[in-house]
């Protein structure tokens, strides 16, 4: 459960991401594909090379979903319901992959926002991404 301080930290950190959200989303995906090659199996139709338009496009989708979650932090299940349905019923993404992408997102944010990425912000973002992952996998049951 996100505390009021966590919510404040997440909103402030995501605010610093600003117009770079899509870029950071794509970078996190690239990190995931390189660090955890089995995740590539969900994207057989993508050009997974560095800077590809498809990875950039999906990175923007990831970032847009996170922006939506930040904006609806008190009601993520409702806000992310359609996305949860998509990943559970159509795409059938293994839930562990959300944890892998979350880790890569944290690394990407730490690399780009070193001054803002304090231990407290790190912990808040980790809890937030875990909450998003829980929501996205809630319809698997």
Swiss-Prot record:
* Source organism superkingdom: Eukaryota
Task: List ligand-binding residues for O2.
Answer: 58
BP GO terms, sorted: hydrogen peroxide catabolic process
On this chain, the residues bearing N6-acetyllysine are 16
Q: Outline the subunit composition.
A: Heterotetramer of two alpha chains and two beta chains.
**Entries under PANTHER family matching the protein:** HEMOGLOBIN FAMILY MEMBER (PTHR11442), HEMOGLOBIN SUBUNIT ALPHA (PTHR11442:SF48)
Similarity annotation: Belongs to the globin family.
* Listed name of the protein: Hemoglobin subunit alpha-A/Q/R/T
Q: Which organism is it from?
A: Macaca fascicularis (Crab-eating macaque)
Taxonomy of the source species: Eukaryota, Metazoa, Chordata, Craniata, Vertebrata
């Amino acid at each position: 459960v996100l505390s009021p301080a966590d919510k404040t930290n997440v909103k402030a950190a995501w605010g610093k991401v600003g117009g770079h959200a899509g870029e950071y989303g794509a970078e996190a995906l690239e990190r995931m594909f390189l660090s955890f090659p089995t995740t590539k199996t969900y994207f057989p139709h993508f050009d997974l090379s560095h800077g590809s338009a498809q990875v950039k496009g999906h990175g923007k989708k990831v970032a847009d979903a996170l922006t939506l979650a930040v904006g609806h932090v008190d009601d993520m299940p409702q806000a992310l319901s359609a996305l949860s349905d998509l990943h559970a019923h159509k795409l059938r993404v293994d839930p562990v992959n959300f944890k892998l992408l979350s880790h890569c997102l944290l690394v990407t944010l730490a690399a780009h926002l070193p001054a803002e990425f304090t231990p407290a912000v790190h912990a808040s973002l980790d809890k937030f991404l875990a909450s998003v992952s829980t929501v996205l996998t809630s319809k698997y049951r």
